[in-house]
């Protein structure tokens, strides 16, 4: 994953979500290692977090031990925590529940069950977040 790739992915996500339904903030936290990249608010779902990742040439993402710890702790406690992976073929994305962070660090993206795979423009986050439970 390159910083430029993730930055471009962030810009695409923000553009896709802006339009009144979502308030999207990108966070860079050096105080709390592992804190996800995005804090998002929707009046239906409330707050939730998304960690952005871009696949590498091996069809994997790089996940730090801090990111694994943060997402596992919070998602297993019931927090709305997700990983959104970009860079898939056909400009698709894949959304994972935060409790899948450790698996994502150990496997290829296609080996880990996700909540959604398809075009970013078709991703209905409010529906998925409202209906998802910790697997």
Question: Residue locations for each model-derived region?
Answer:
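Nucleic-acid nuclease catalytic cores
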Residues: 75-101
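Charged phosphate-binding loop/patch that engages nucleotide di/tri-phosphates or the phosphate backbone
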Residues: 111-135
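Acidic-basic catalytic patches of nuclease active cores, encompassing PD-(D/E)XK
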Residues: 1-29, 43, 93
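Beta-rich catalytic cores
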Residues: 34
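Active-site-adjacent loop/helix micro-motif of nuclease/hydrolase catalytic cores
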Residues: 56-68
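Conserved catalytic cores of phosphodiester-cleaving nucleases, focusing on short active-site segments
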Residues: 38-40, 46-57
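Sequence/structural signature of beta-propeller domains
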Residues: 61, 96-107
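Anion (oxyanion) recognition and catalysis
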Residues: 18, 72-76
